[in-house]
Structures are given as structure tokens and as C-alpha cells.
């Protein structure tokens, strides 16, 4: 370990003192006894050994090398890189760190960015736990252990490292620390509070059996919980679907048609300003439709006797259906032109970021996302699920040989995959992004189950679903000098689709 004289003597002194206290040789110490000697912080170690407390890392190295000590998560904060230097040597440690730097650069990280030191420490921690100084031999189980039981300051970095190694082909798939550390499942809140146990058991059984899209199952699930609270208060004798009659179903339709925001629900802080106002017609119709789906499935699966027809009873009345129709929230021509100009002229200085640190996403990717949102006419989910190589060019005989840009759109909630012509600027900006896009690992398409190369991926992760609404649109509004809200409300991802569709519908040709 090439220790200097002072820490060398201090280490011998400290271990000798502890052997005398414990009345046994250091190689007979248990993991718990080593943890007690090493202490959970540098300050506690200094306080324990006084003037000879300047050698904590050397004591850890001796425990690791000579006695198989591996309870490193109990040691609190320490410099994993320096401990690796002591036990693996500088040559092996620096070679591993250099290999990690190459892999990070390959997936889009900026070399020398001080914010990435945590990833290096996570690698060193994994090598120490596996006793293996090669990044290629780190396994995902070790990183998951660090993310769940390791020091708090390394948990997020361990998940990030897993995605970097997955992108480099070391193992199949990384993991997301934020998902695994949620206190409850996504968007679950306290949704089952006050729902009768018997009704809840039927709902959970239906939820586990249904083969609809996950988003459709989730939407239906929350409506069923709302219905359960309504039953507990108004029809406690019908908390089992088996006890429902035609009259119960009609009572639910009546209640749904008069439903107000926050009624029969446990919304927490959501919709606080609108609470108590009448729900939108489409939302009230959804309450009826989802309960209809529930009873239709139960009867089709033979789980309950047929006492009424969901198709005839659980349907929206005409008075409600007539209130539902197309209502595109288009952006005015003036604001739309400013947004288009902003999207075509984004510069590095327009991207928010800390002083001295670049924006998380590359400029080329932000430009491609902006232009695709402004000209593509796609849903947010379709934009974020676009695949590499989605742009093709076709010569046109009618336009003096000018090329037509064709774009492959992935499977959506209403259509199979298809190809559509788009403005050439979309193809230009997407191809510019593909030229600088770092190689990324294959990921599973949540709709089709295929392993694909998503176009908008960076540092081993897809662009988050909230990025367009919460980051990109405000960025374009700021660049264009317009407010984020207009006469029709907040400018969101879907309003671009509504605006483009309305423009095409009203066009002469």
C-alpha cells in the first residue's frame, strides 16, 4: 500500500489497541467487530483513537485484504477511489476508471464534468464488493445492492452506472433508482382508502386478469375505486358485484351524470382549485364507460350471474352524449408562428443550465424534438417512441425532382405503425441529431414489446414523458417571448397536434 510512516504506525497502534480490548487477534474479528473498529464516520474514528486516528482508510484496507471484510456500506462516507488504489494498485484502478470514462463518453457524458464523480465512486464501490478491478465484470446485482443498501450518496449513481454498462453491452438492462425507491407505486397515492374490502378484492382480481393496455387498466381502476366509495355510502348492500341489479346500475349512471370534481375520491392536493365544480362531460361519460367495461368483463368471464345488460343500462344518456364533441384547443396563428421561429432558431445559449455546466440534453436533440413537435402532428407518446432510422427520402417527379421526406410513426393507441410525409425540415433536424447521437442500448417498446433503438435517448435513458410539457414547451415559449398560457389555457404537447390538424382541415387543398 506504500503507506507513509505516520499512518503505518497509527494503523499498527490502533489494531493493537483493539486486539487488547477484544482479547483476540485481528484475524479472528467478526464483520461486526471490524465495523465497530472502523466506525461509521471519519470523525468518530478520530474521536475513538485520538492522535492515531489519521489512518482509517489503511485500517479498512487491511480489513479488506487480510480478513475478507466486505461490509463497506456500514462505513458511511469514505473515498472509494482511494481505497481501490490501496487494495488494487494505481495501475488497475486507473485503468478501470479510464475504461469507465470511455463508456460514459460513448453514451453522451461530457469528459471532465465534476458532477460525474459519483459514478466513478459507484464503480469503485462495486469493484470493492466483488473484489474484481475490471468494469466488465461488474454485475447488475451488485449495483442493485448498492442502490438499495449502500451509502445514500451512491444510490442514484449506482443506477446511472447500471445504464451506462448496459449501453456498453456488459449486461442486458440497467435500472432506474427513482422507480425502485418510490414509497408507493406510480400515481397510486392513497387511492384505496375508504374502499370496501370486498369491492376492492373484485377490482384487484379484474385488474390482474384484464389484457387491456396498462394505461386503460389504470384509468378504469381509479374509476372503480371511486365507485366503491359511492357504494359504501349509498348502497352498502351492493359492495359485491354479484349483488348489483338493474336499479343499482341505473343509480350509478345518475350519480355519474351529476358527479363533481373531488367527489367520492381521495385526490390529496390535486384539483384543489376546481374541487366542487361539475366534472367535464367527457369525464362523466368515462365514469359510466369504465364501470360498463368492468361488468361486461365479469359477465363474459363467468365470474357473476347476468342480472342486467351493461350495454343497455351502463351507457351515457343522450343528454350527456350531446355535450361531447370535438373541441380542438388550437394555438392562434400569431403565437404559432412565433413558436415555429423559436424552434427553428434554438441556440446553445437558450438552453437552461448551471454556470460552467452544459445543459443535460445535447442541442441537436432539443432542436430535433422541437421541430418534430412543431411540424409532426404527433402525440407526445408517439414522439418519444420514435425510432432511429425513422426518416426516409423519396424523389418526387411532380416537384422537379425535389425529395419528399417520409417519416415512420410507431404504433399508437388508435393505429398500427404507418408512414407519413412531413416537412423536409423535420428530416433535416432528425438526421443531424442521428449524426451526433451516442450509441445506446436496446430498450423494450412498452406498446409492442419489441427491443428497439429509440431515437430520443441520452446517457442510457429515454427522454422522460413529462419533458415536452414541463421543459421543452416552456423553453420555446421563453425563446419566442410569449406566455405559457393563452386564451385556451396552458400550451401543452397535444395543442400542437390540434393546431396542425385544424390547419390541414381548413386548408384549400
Identify what each model region corresponds to.
Residues 1-351, 371-372:
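Charge-rich, intrinsically disordered N-terminal extensions
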Residues 234, 239-240, 280, 284-287, ...:
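Extended accessory and catalytic-adjacent subdomains in large enzymes
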Amino acid at each position: 500500500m506504500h503507506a507513509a510512516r505516520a499512518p503505518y504506525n497509527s494503523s499498527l497502534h490502533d489494531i493493537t489497541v483493539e486486539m487488547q480490548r477484544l482479547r483476540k487477534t485481528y484475524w479472528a474479528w467478526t464483520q461486526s467487530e471490524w465495523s465497530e473498529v472502523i466506525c461509521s464516520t471519519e470523525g468518530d474514528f478520530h474521536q475513538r483513537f485520538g492522535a492515531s486516528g489519521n489512518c482509517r482508510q489503511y485500517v479498512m484496507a487491511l480489513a479488506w485484504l487480510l480478513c475478507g471484510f466486505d461490509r463497506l456500506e456500514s462505513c458511511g462516507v469514505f473515498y472509494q477511489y482511494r481505497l481501490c488504489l490501496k487494495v488494487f494498485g494505481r495501475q488497475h484502478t486507473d485503468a478501470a476508471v479510464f475504461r469507465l470514462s470511455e463508456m460514459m463518453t460513448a453514451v453522451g457524458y461530457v469528459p471532465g464534468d465534476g458532477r460525474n464523480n459519483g459514478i466513478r465512486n459507484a464503480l469503485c464501490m462495486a469493484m470493492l464488493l466483488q473484489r474484481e478491478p475490471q468494469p466488465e465484470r461488474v454485475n447488475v446485482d451488485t449495483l442493485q445492492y448498492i442502490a438499495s443498501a449502500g451509502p445514500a450518496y451512491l444510490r442514484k449513481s449506482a443506477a446511472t452506472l447500471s445504464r451506462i454498462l448496459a449501453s456498453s453491452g456488459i449486461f442486458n438492462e440497467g435500472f432506474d433508482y427513482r422507480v425502485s425507491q418510490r414509497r408507493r407505486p406510480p400515481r397510486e397515492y392513497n387511492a384505496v382508502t375508504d374502499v370496501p374490502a370486498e369491492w376492492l378484492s373484485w377490482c384487484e382480481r379484474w385488474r390482474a386478469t384484464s389484457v387491456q393496455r396498462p394505461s386503460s387498466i389504470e384509468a378504469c381502476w381509479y374509476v372503480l375505486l371511486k365507485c366503491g366509495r359511492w357504494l359504501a355510502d349509498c348502497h352498502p348492500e351492493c359492495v359485491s358485484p354479484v349483488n348489483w341489479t338493474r336499479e343499482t346500475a341505473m343509480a350509478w349512471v345518475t350519480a355519474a351524470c351529476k358527479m363533481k370534481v373531488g367527489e367520492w375520491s381521495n385526490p390529496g392536493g390535486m384539483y384543489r382549485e376546481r374541487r366542487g365544480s361539475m366534472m367535464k362531460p367527457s369525464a362523466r361519460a368515462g365514469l359510466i364507460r369504465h364501470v360498463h367495461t368492468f361488468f361486461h368483463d365479469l359477465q363474459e368471464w363467468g365470474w357473476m350471474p347476468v342480472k342486467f345488460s351493461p350495454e343497455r343500462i351502463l351507457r351515457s344518456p343522450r343528454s350527456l352524449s350531446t355535450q361531447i364533441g370535438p373541441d380542438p384547443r388550437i394555438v392562434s396563428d400569431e403565437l404559432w408562428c412565433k413558436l415555429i421561429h423559436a424552434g427553428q432558431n434554438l441556440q446553445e445559449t437558450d438552453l437552461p443550465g448551471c454556470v460552467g455546466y452544459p445543459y443535460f440534453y445535447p442541442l441537436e436533440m432539443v432542436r430535433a424534438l422541437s421541430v418534430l413537435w412543431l411540424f409532426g402532428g404527433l402525440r407526445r407518446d408517439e414522439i418519444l417512441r420514435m425510432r432511429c432510422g425513422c426518416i426516409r427520402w423519396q424523389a418526387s417527379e411532380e416537384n422537379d425532382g425535389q425529395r419528399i421526406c417520409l417519416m415512420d410513426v410507431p404504433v399508437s393507441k388508435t393505429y398500427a405503425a404507418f408512414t407519413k410525409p412531413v416537412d423536409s425540415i423535420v428530416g433535416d433536424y432528425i438526421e443531424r441529431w442521428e449524426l451526433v447521437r451516442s450509441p445506446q442500448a436496446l430498450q423494450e417498446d412498452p406498446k409492442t414489446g419489441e427491443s428497439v433503438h429509440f431515437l430520443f435517448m441520452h446517457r442510457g435513458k429515454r427522454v422522460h414523458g413529462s419533458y415536452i410539457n414541463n421543459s421543452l414547451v416552456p423553453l420555446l415559449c421563453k425563446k419566442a417571448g410569449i406566455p405559457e398560457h393563452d386564451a385556451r389555457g396552458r400550451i401543452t404537447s397535444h395543442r400542437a397536434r390540434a393546431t396542425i390538424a385544424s390547419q390541414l382541415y381548413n386548408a384549400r387543398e
